[in-house]
Design a protein with these regions (language model features):
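Active-site and adjacent loop segments of nucleotide-processing enzymes
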Residues: 6-169
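Active-site palm subdomain of RNA-directed nucleic acid polymerases
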Residues: 1
Length: 169
């Protein structure tokens, strides 16, 4: 029995889906699922794609690895305006998202599809560049794990600038 969705909306980077419970007599409360907003998930997908296109141009393996770790993990960022570091990343930007959220799963599938693709423009560019070992190394990264385990990585401020460079538009 699928849940009957009553309301779905996006607000402040989140997607809220309100539905009736499976069985009416189980509970009087509606179910509220909290996910990353589809617009935000699409932004992550665009960044994943741009990271791979940049790799196809530069062949900088370490930068590609760091970009995927950056997207799927959590990190510290120094904010010069308040002279403090703040936590950011897939968990710290979306702490209210449930670990089994649909868009987190979709981001993992998207990354997997790009890494393992056999057809398409990006696949043609990546095929001669990515070895099986490299693919395995990339597929260790996961949005779900980064969120649920609060996986933390450390980058210098200059490395973060390099990582973000291909996403500027």
């Amino acid at each position: 029995n699928p849940k009957k969705i009553i309301l779905s909306f996006e607000y402040l980077g989140y997607k809220f889906t309100v539905s009736d419970p499976y069985k009416k007599f189980d509970t009087n409360f509606r179910i509220v699922d909290v996910d990353i907003a589809t617009t935000k998930a699409n932004k992550y997908k665009k960044r994943i794609s741009r990271a791979f296109y940049d790799f196809a141009k530069t062949n900088d393996w370490n930068l590609l690895k760091d970009r995927i770790k950056f997207l799927t993990g959590n990190f510290q960022v120094f904010n010069p305006h308040i002279n403090k570091t703040k936590l950011a990343g897939i968990f710290y930007n979306y702490p209210e998202v449930q670990n089994d959220a649909k868009n987190l799963k979709e981001l993992d599938h998207y990354l997997r599809r790009i890494v393992l693709a056999k057809h398409g423009r990006l696949a043609i560019l990546l095929r001669p560049l990515l070895t099986s070992k490299m693919k395995r190394e990339l597929l260790i990264n996961s949005f779900i794990k980064g969120h649920s385990d609060k996986k933390f990585i450390h980058f210098s401020q200059s490395r973060i600038s390099q990582i973000k460079k291909c996403w500027k538009y």
